[in-house]
């Protein structure tokens, strides 16, 4: 018995519908993948923007507080190897009081003035400047900040150091070189393979008395 043209047409129509559905599904999956990728790129960009702003904040603190710069050179606040850091994590230097507040500096004590500034910076790295009902949300994931001294410093400088911020990304990329400022800051913290992010700014605070 030969097949009727109507049955062949219905069979072809069903196949066409299935192919159309398959193509639509592939297209939707592609769009979803692109949207996910775009969201990841946007979040990475947001984190880097926050890090740049916070690094510039510490840069401004250093340049505008020339009188207390020697206090920043205290080994409890800065280091030459990135082992001293503030921000997130149990290994962070903690300058806060028992209530979690940054202490008031003691008059004439340069180290306590610098510690108060480092404490405030550490709180900002924890996202304290922006909060919701769940807690701090204004900073990068796992952010840590270091002041890495350059020794010997530039001639006629009160301080010569790197302001460094590291944090955890959400995409796998190339980690900073181990001997770079971003690789040395909080180097014992494992963010995961290819997920360490970092920026650094060299800050030179000149000794204006010698320059004159």
What are these regions, as identified by a protein language model?
Residues 18, 46, 56-212:
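Flexible, low-complexity segments enriched in proline/glycine/serine and punctuated by aromatic residues
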């Amino acid at each position: 018995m030969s097949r009727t043209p109507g049955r062949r047409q219905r069979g072809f129509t069903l196949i066409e519908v299935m192919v159309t559905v398959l193509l639509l599904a592939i297209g939707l999956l592609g769009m979803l993948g692109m949207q996910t990728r775009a969201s990841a790129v946007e979040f990475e960009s947001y984190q880097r923007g926050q890090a740049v702003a916070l690094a510039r904040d510490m840069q401004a603190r250093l340049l505008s507080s020339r009188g207390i710069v020697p206090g920043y050179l205290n080994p409890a606040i800065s280091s030459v190897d990135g082992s001293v850091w503030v921000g997130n994590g149990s290994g962070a230097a903690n300058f806060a009081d028992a209530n979690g507040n940054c202490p008031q500096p003691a008059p004439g004590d340069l180290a306590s003035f610098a510690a108060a500034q480092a404490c405030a910076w550490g709180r900002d790295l924890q996202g304290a400047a922006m909060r919701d009902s769940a807690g701090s949300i204004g900073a990068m994931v796992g952010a840590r900040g270091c002041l890495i001294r350059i020794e010997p410093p530039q001639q006629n400088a009160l301080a010569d150091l790197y302001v460094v911020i590291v944090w955890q990304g959400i995409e796998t990329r190339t980690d900073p070189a181990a001997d770079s400022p971003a690789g040395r800051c909080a180097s014992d913290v494992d963010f995961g393979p290819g997920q360490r992010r970092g920026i650094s700014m060299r800050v030179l605070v000149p000794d204006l008395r010698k320059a004159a």
